[in-house]
């Protein structure tokens, strides 16, 4: 999709590019924290309340060009009405001349996927606790006619209290929906988590397909690996369609029986959510979700976002903050311990996006990045102070691609952001471990960080 108008603009004068902020309505947009094929997600601040939110930026022309307006309006309207403790909340919808903005709850505890990467696998009780919350969310959305169709650990977020939040519910609007036979016909979703009937592309029930994905997630949480996996896509499809599940020895007998009922290749005999709620293994320590009585929700903003009238369009204003404010923000943010950042991330804490600081010039930084990418098998495209890195070999989920950008945060100090824009997250972890070792000499360390490093 085209670069969001909220994106930082061009190169600044002098040493390098300066980070710019953009106002969209009452929201001040920050850095990109996620990127997909049809949208970007940016962190944002509500200037009235000071609250931190996430804003999904969609290309308005893409929506209009593909005649998706009514589908998306229906799906977004449904999502705005959904208020569940385990589903990321949609607060508001706005539009400019070229973009649609979905204002979402900001979930700051990271992905459940990172917990698996760092721990290897979860204990049965902990995995069950997360599975309880996942089923609560899926059941609630299904009851309102909304299916996810791309459930995977990367779409399961954790808040600061460790509660599960499912993201991207309702985005099935971006693909063709139900046909005359009442079945869905679009094979979306990550291959390893997709149900056999979805791969067959003969139409499928959205509820049964989501249940299958939930079963794969539960297996991964408890085993630390996928039940069906192969680098060859056709072999992977065959494994999924046969659905011969081999559970590791540490699974309890109850867990084994339960997972096999979920990973039934026949959607007609596969366990339903109603039956899941009655299963003995599932019911252990289960607590039904508690709901607060929400206020009436207006859908006027959804209609206005798709209205071509000028009066309904939100204004976009670019502003440039002082460098010291940007530097202070970086220094004080959790996880941005400047000099120690690389060391921490090399110990396995790197996620789908990360950053580091350097006292080198932007030209030196970009030259060093390009130099490091060659031996790792990555092609590089440069534009101003942005770079697109793309692997020359296909991985489990296609080609690994990484976006990088250099910002000036203070005189003679620059921040480099890297984020995965395509491919497998585990492959990104492996790439980053090799990549970071090549860039050690350009990473800035404060005097106190350097002393601490010597002591270690």
From Swiss-Prot:
Domain of life per record:
Eukaryota
Under Gene3D superfamilies, the record lists:
Kinase associated domain 1, KA1 (3.30.310.80), Phosphorylase Kinase, domain 1 (3.30.200.20), Transferase(Phosphotransferase) domain 1 (1.10.510.10)
Please give the cofactor(s) recorded in the UniProt entry for this protein: Mn(2+)
Q: Which reaction does it catalyse?
A: L-seryl-[protein] + ATP = O-phospho-L-seryl-[protein] + ADP + H(+); L-threonyl-[protein] + ATP = O-phospho-L-threonyl-[protein] + ADP + H(+)
Q: Which UniProt keywords apply?
A: ATP-binding, Kinase, Manganese, Nucleotide-binding, Serine/threonine-protein kinase, Transferase
* Region annotation Activation loop: where it falls in the sequence: 168-197
Q: Name one GO biological process term.
A: signal transduction
Q: Which EC numbers characterise this protein's activity in its record? A: 2.7.11.1
User: What is the top EC class of this enzyme, as a single word?
Assistant: transferase
Question: What region holds the NAF domain?
Answer: 318-343
One annotated GO molecular function is: protein serine kinase activity
Domain Protein kinase span(s) in chain numbering: 27-282
Query: Which residue ranges does the record annotate as region PPI?
Result: 351-380
Sorted alphabetically, which InterPro entries does this protein's record hold?
Kinase-like_dom_sf, NAF/FISL_domain, NAF_dom, Prot_kinase_dom, Protein_kinase_ATP_BS, Ser/Thr_kinase_AS
Q: Which residues form the signal peptide?
A: none
Q: What positions constitute the catalytic site?
A: 150 (proton acceptor)
Instruction: Report the domain remarks.
Output: The activation loop within the kinase domain is the target of phosphorylation/activation by upstream protein kinases. The PPI motif mediates the interaction with the ABI (abscisic acid-insensitive) phosphatases.
What family does the database annotate? Belongs to the protein kinase superfamily. CAMK Ser/Thr protein kinase family. SNF1 subfamily.
- Which PANTHER family does the entry link to? CALCIUM/CALMODULIN-DEPENDENT PROTEIN KINASE KINASE-RELATED, CBL-INTERACTING SERINE_THREONINE-PROTEIN KINASE 9
What's the stated role of this polypeptide?
CIPK serine-threonine protein kinases interact with CBL proteins. Binding of a CBL protein to the regulatory NAF domain of CIPK protein lead to the activation of the kinase in a calcium-dependent manner.
Q: Per its record, how is this protein called by name?
A: CBL-interacting protein kinase 9
């Amino acid at each position: 999709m085209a670069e969001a108008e909220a994106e930082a603009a061009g190169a600044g004068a002098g040493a390098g590019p300066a980070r710019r902020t953009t106002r969209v309505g009452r929201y001040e947009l920050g850095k990109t924290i996620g990127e997909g094929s049809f949208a970007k997600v940016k962190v944002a601040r509500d200037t009235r309340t000071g609250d931190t939110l996430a804003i999904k930026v969609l290309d308005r022309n893409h929506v209009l060009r593909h005649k998706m307006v009514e589908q998306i309006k229906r799906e977004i309207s449904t999502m705005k009405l959904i208020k569940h403790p385990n589903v990321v909340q949609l607060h508001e919808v706005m539009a400019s001349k070229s973009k649609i903005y979905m204002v979402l709850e900001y979930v700051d505890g990271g992905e459940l996927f990172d917990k698996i990467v760092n721990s290897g696998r979860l204990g049965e009780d902990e995995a069950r606790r997360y599975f309880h919350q996942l089923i609560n969310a899926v059941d609630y959305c299904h009851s309102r006619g909304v299916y996810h169709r791309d459930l995977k650990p990367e779409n399961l977020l954790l808040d600061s209290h460790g509660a599960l939040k499912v993201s991207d519910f309702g985005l099935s609007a971006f693909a063709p929906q139900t046909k005359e036979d009442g079945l869905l016909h679009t094979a979306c979703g990550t291959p390893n988590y997709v149900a056999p009937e979805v791969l067959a592309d003969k139409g499928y029930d959205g509820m049964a397909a989501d249940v299958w994905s939930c079963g794969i997630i539960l297996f991964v949480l408890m085993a630390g690996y996928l039940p069906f996996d192969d680098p060859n896509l056709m072999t992977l499809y065959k494994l999924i369609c046969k659905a011969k599940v081999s559970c590791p020895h540490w699974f309890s007998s109850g867990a084994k029986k339960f997972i096999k009922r979920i990973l039934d290749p026949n959607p007609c005999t596969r366990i339903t959510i109603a039956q899941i709620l009655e299963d003995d293994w599932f019911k252990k320590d289960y607590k039904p979700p508690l709901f607060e009585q929400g206020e009436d929700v207006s859908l006027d903003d959804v209609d206005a976002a798709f209205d071509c009238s000028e009066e309904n369009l939100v204004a976009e204003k670019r502003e440039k903050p002082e460098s010291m404010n940007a530097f202070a923000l970086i220094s004080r943010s959790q996880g941005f311990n400047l000099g120690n950042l690389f060391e921490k991330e090399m110990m396995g804490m790197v996620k789908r996006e990360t950053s580091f600081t350097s006292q080198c010039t932007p030209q030196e930084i970009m030259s060093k990045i390009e130099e490091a990418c060659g031996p790792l098998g990555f092609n590089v495209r440069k534009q101003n102070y942005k770079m697109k890195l793309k692997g020359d070999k296909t991985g489990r989920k296609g080609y690994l691609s990484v976006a990088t950008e250099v910002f000036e945060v203070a005189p003679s100090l620059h921040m480099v952001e890297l984020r995965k824009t395509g491919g497998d997250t585990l492959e990104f972890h492996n790439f980053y471990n090799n990549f970071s070792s090549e860039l050690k000499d350009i990473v800035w360390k404060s005097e106190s960080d350097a002393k601490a490093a010597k002591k270690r």
